[in-house]
């Protein structure tokens, strides 16, 4: 497997629960290095731009409203098969369907307030990382 980078967002519901450290520990225990991170309060334009691919979906406005409701932690994760590992750690989008021990099963409240976001493919990861870290040099530890 190749070393990959993926974007992860700890959403407002999880930030409000003060579980950033627990989520970071799960990343690191599973071989994912945090090579860039920052806390940000998304504007409506930021959230709409990031989730533009979902603009025509019925949940778009609720998603944007939720993502601007509080600060988020945005991080770049790096490691072998990072995209798949992160998605496995997150669990199913609907926390009621997420496997026990996943971030969403343990911490998410609903399909809307589902604690985390993660890139779903290498192409998506590249676009999402550039969205939040456009001019940042990211270095491997």
Swiss-Prot record:
Active site annotation, chain numbering: 117
Keywords, in A-Z order: ATP-binding, Cytoplasm, Kinase, Magnesium, Metal-binding, Nucleotide metabolism, Nucleotide-binding, Phosphoprotein, Transferase
Residues reported to bind ATP: 11, 59, 87, 93, 104, 114
Any one GO molecular function term: nucleoside diphosphate kinase activity
One Pfam family here: NDK
One GO term of the biological process aspect: CTP biosynthetic process
Domain of life per record: Bacteria
SS bond partners: none
The protein's Enzyme Commission number: 2.7.4.6
Compartments, record wording: Cytoplasm
UniProt enzyme class: transferase
Gene3D superfamilies recorded: Nucleoside diphosphate kinase-like domain
Family: Belongs to the NDK family.
Record note on quaternary structure: Homotetramer.
Protein name: Nucleoside diphosphate kinase
Organism: Nitrosospira multiformis (strain ATCC 25196 / NCIMB 11849 / C 71)
Gene transcribed to yield this protein: ndk
